Amino acid sequence: MSFQRTTGTYRNSHPDSQGYYGRYGGIDYPAELRPELAALAETHQLAWNMPDFQRKLHDARIYFQGRPTPVHRLANLSAQIGGATLFVKREDLNHTGAHKLNHCVGFALLARHMGKTKLIAETGAGQHGVALATAAAYFGLECEVHIGEVDLEKARSNVSRMKVLGATVIAVGQGQSALKEASDSAYNAYARQYRHALYAIGSAIGPHPFPLIVRDFQSVVGQEARQQFMAVNGGALPDHVVACVAGGSNAMGIYAGFLDDQGVSLHGIEPLGKSAKPGEHAATLTFGTPGTLHGSHCIVLQDADGNIAKVSSIASGLVYPGVGPEICMLHDAVSFTAVDDEQTVAAFYRLSRTEGVVPALESAHAVAFAMQLAARCHPSERILVTLSGRGDKDVDFVMENYSD
C-alpha cells in the first residue's frame, strides 16, 4: 500500500515499531549488530524526549551552528523568470556550509550519551565528512571518515578541512570509488569498532534507527522554514517545496515542516546525470526497483540479476544507487523529477550571477527544477527551495570542466 498524506502528526506515525516505512526500511544487518542497533533506537527515543538533551541540542544549534538559517526571497531571479516567486532556505549558511551538521551534532550528542568515544561515517562531496569532523572536535570525540578516491580528488579542499579538524580520512579504491563504496567501507569499520564507536551515517539511509535519527535531527530545517516563510508571507504557506534527493537527509529535513499540509506540493529532484542510459545517472526513484542496500529494504538501481548498478552525477553527494526508506514510502505523496548535469550547471551559474549565492551542485539540481516550475506557475504562487549547501567545493571543478 502506498502512503497518502493526511491531516495529522506525521512524525508519530512513522516508522512502525519494526523500523518500517510502509514496506520499506527494517533491519537487514548481521545478528551481532542488532542488539547495538536496538540500544541505539532506545537511546535516541529516550534522549529525544529528555529536556536536558533537548537543551544541549538547542544550545548547539544556536551558539555553535549559528541557527536559525534564514529564508529569503530571490527577488532578482523571480523577476527574470516572471512566474511564481522563489524563496530559499539557506542551509548553505549553516556552520560548515551545508545541512549535514544538523544530524552530525545530533549523533555526537548521542555518542556521548551512550559513552561512545568515536564517530565513523562515509562522505561523498565531503560536506558530511567536514560536518562530522567539526562535531567530533566540538564534543571531544575521535572521528573516522571514509571517502571514495574519485570523490577525494573532486573534494580535496574538504578533505583538507577534515584533517585540520583532526579526523582520520580513509580513501576507498574499490568499485566506482564513490559514495556507495565509501558507505560499504564505513559500515565494515563500524562492524569492527561498534563497542566504542557510533556510525554517524551520512543520510536518511540504512537500517532502523538510522533513517529516523537523521530525519529527527534534520527536521529543524522544516520547522524553521515553516515559521520563517509564514512570517514573511502574511501567514501563508508555500505552494511548492523543492529539495534535491539522494539518500534523503536534506529532503526529509525540509519536508518535515510540511508533510501534514495537504495544500503544499512537495517535490524531490534526482540527478539524471549525463543521460537516462544505465550507468549515466543516479535517478533511483525514476528508474529503480525494490531491493536491499546497506541494511535496508528500499528502491535501488540494479540490473536484472539484482547487482547494484553503476551511477553517475556531476554532484558527488548524489552519486548513490539507492534512496532512503522514508523517501521510498513517500513516492506517491511527493512529485519526483530528474534534472541532468547541463541543467544543473546552468542553474549553478544563474543563481550565482543573479543573486550572489553560489550553490552546491547538489542544491543546484533543486534550483534548476524550481526555475522551470516557476516559469509555468501563476505569479501568485510561491516556491520554497532548500539550498542544502554552498558551492565552494564545486567552483574549481565547474570552471575547469563547464564553460559558462
Predicted regions and their residues:
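Claisen-condensing/thiolase-fold acyl-transfer catalytic domains that form or cleave C-C bonds
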Residues: 245-249, 341-402
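A short, small-residue-rich loop immediately preceding and capping a beta-strand
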Residues: 95, 103, 111-148, 236-250, ...
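Active-site-proximal loop->helix
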Residues: 120, 128-186, 277-288, 394-403
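Short glycine/serine/threonine-rich phosphate/pyrophosphate-binding segments
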Residues: 97, 101-107, 121-139, 153-156, ...
